[in-house]
A protein has these predicted regions:
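Extracellular structured ligand-interaction cores
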Residues: 9, 104-106, 147, 208
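Alpha-helical scaffold segments that mediate packing/assembly in large oligomeric complexes
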Residues: 18-97
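Extended amphipathic alpha-helical segments with heptad-repeat/coiled-coil character used for oligomerization
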Residues: 96, 101-103, 107-112
Length: 242
């Protein structure tokens, strides 16, 4: 398996006038904003690679009497295609059948807050404060369903293009086993925080400073069978306008 390695980064200028007149420490404030940008950028790169996986479960259409109709594409989803515990039990069964190792003691699902909202109303869902040992939870973890632990993030994949039903968005929830994917750990190419003080470089009047970051990243799916992409449909217009 090969992958192309790319460099990413961002920066913001800080003038001498701003630093003289502002109440806040602008270097600290800029660092906080850019740190968030750096993390979300790297997460998004990995997310988009994983969201291209081929091991997919589509939420079925549900009729008024509870009859299910299979769905085989994002375009075919409708308002009745909602997130249910059954989808995740199916995903866990697939991973188990493929001998996918858990991450710790469970598989891990990456879920958007709007999708998690639907899941939290299910009686089978166990919230983190009910864990026997809540100290072992991951950052962003919201609960557990069977042997799947859920990590909530606004960076979870959302489709709103021509492959989706008109006027509606499709949310993707990833269910992962160990060794499903890999990312780069390049020596000397990790995230770097860069601060340039006033007068650095071509700045004869000491007017320009800057704060920035850069880093290298590549991500690849390693074993398709060790990850499942569950596609769900969210119908509220406010959710489509994200």
């Amino acid at each position: 398996i090969t992958s192309d390695l790319h460099q990413y980064g961002g920066w913001t200028p800080l003038t001498d006038v701003l630093q003289m007149t502002a109440i806040d420490n602008n270097v600290v404030q800029a660092t906080r904003v850019l740190a968030s940008q750096a993390g979300r950028t790297m997460d998004s790169i990995t997310r988009d690679v994983l969201a291209g996986g081929t091991n997919v479960i589509y939420a079925p259409k549900l009729s008024a009497d509870g009859t299910e109709t299979a769905v085989t594409s994002r375009k075919a989803l409708d308002k009745s295609c909602t997130l249910t515990p059954k989808l995740f039990f199916q995903a866990a069964a697939q991973l188990g059948a493929m001998n996918a190792d858990p991450i710790g003691d469970s598989y891990i699902a990456i879920i958007h807050p709007y999708a998690a909202y639907d899941l939290k109303t299910c009686k089978e869902f166990m919230e983190v404060h009910k864990y026997a040992d809540p100290d072992t939870m991951f950052r962003g973890e919201i609960g557990k369903l069977g042997n799947i632990r859920f990590i909530e993030t606004s960076e979870a994949k959302i489709w709103k293009d021509d492959t989706c039903p008109a006027g509606l968005a499709v949310f993707g929830t990833l269910v992962l086993g160990a060794h499903a994917y890999g990312v780069t750990e390049l020596e000397g190419g990790g995230l770097e925080h860069i601060v340039k003080q006033l007068g650095y470089g071509d700045d004869p009047l000491n007017q320009r400073a800057s704060v920035g970051w850069k880093g290298m990243r590549a991500a690849e799916r390693l074993v398709e069978q060790y990850m499942v992409l569950s596609l769900i449909h969210i119908s509220e217009p406010t959710r489509h306008s994200l």
